Regions:
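Structured C-terminal cap/extension of enzyme domains
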Residues: 29-132
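Ligand/cofactor pocket segment of small-molecule handling proteins
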Residues: 1-40
Length: 132
């Protein structure tokens, strides 16, 4: 798993790794790029809140449908970054709560998402067509 977000490093890993060694992106924002370079998948935070769209993006990339993969990735791009405005999994839990999938309430050592990020994440959800 390469979670550096450095496409050059990911490309080098793919070039140097044995053929049977699978390379996964651990960085949502650069996941599509690594897939298109020959990566084998994405270990995704975004998939916790938009699993179908992430799956469709990965399938499109794997099948060579660059147009669809780019459209889907562009819809998810804000989530890829904004889900990290605070320590993971705090923003993810907030989004999933907004989706109505879990009740509110976070246990220590986690703390609630700072209110200053609510509108930012709501906007990212809208761009990804996530229903609340």
């Amino acid at each position: 798993k390469d979670a550096t977000g450095d496409i050059g490093r990911g490309s080098d890993l793919l070039r140097r790794a044995p053929k049977d060694f699978l390379i996964y992106s651990g960085d949502d924002a650069s996941g599509l790029a690594l897939l298109l370079l020959g990566g084998h998948g994405v270990i995704s935070v975004t998939a916790n809140v938009a699993p179908k769209k992430m799956h469709e993006m990965c399938v499109a990339a794997a099948s060579g449908d660059l147009v669809t993969a780019r459209v889907l990735n562009n819809q998810l791009l804000r989530l890829h970054t904004d889900l990290f405005v605070e320590a993971n999994p705090i923003p993810v839990k907030w989004v999933v709560e907004q989706m109505g999938l879990i009740r509110s309430g976070i246990r220590l050592p986690l703390t609630p998402l700072s209110t200053q990020y609510h509108s930012l994440l709501r906007e990212a959800m809208q761009l990804a067509n996530i229903q609340v």
